[in-house]
Amino acid sequence: SRYDALFMTYSQPIRWDWRLMAAQCYQESTFDPSAQSWAGACGLMQIMPATATRLGLSHDKLFDPESNIAAAARFLGQLDRKFSDISDRGERLNFVLASYNGGYHHIRDAMALARRDGRDQHRWADVSRYVLLLSTPRYYQDPIVKYGYMRGSETVDYVQRIRQRWQSYSGVRGGT
């Protein structure tokens, strides 16, 4: 994309493959710097205004490609550190992407459900099932769940699509 140099620059401090950031950007906005979602997310990396404020990104810079990518990289780095309990880097990437899309606390709720049910809370294959279940009352009303309902199918699909596009951008065939 025309933003690859920015992905290369801002992915380095967080030790991400720049092609993964590019794949995420495609999923977020199809590389449209003026994109705005129905929920109010803005710019290339679809940053919510409240998140932008927490990241030190002024609202007048939300649609600036470099500022938006730089802020998204800071946010991804923060999420990565919040999942330091997941030692496998490949697994951790799934949780970071899921949190970027669906919210950190919702993903932690799904992890708590997985743990309670004897599943591996550090494996996306196990936790993604609970992300999906957080759209059903039996699960989002469970006392262990602190943040309630989430549209889990969107988040699970988001992670899968980015991983697939990343493989494509990296020239990888098959695998995970």
Language-model region placement:
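Catalytic glycan-binding domains that act on GlcNAc-containing polysaccharides
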Residues: 1-176
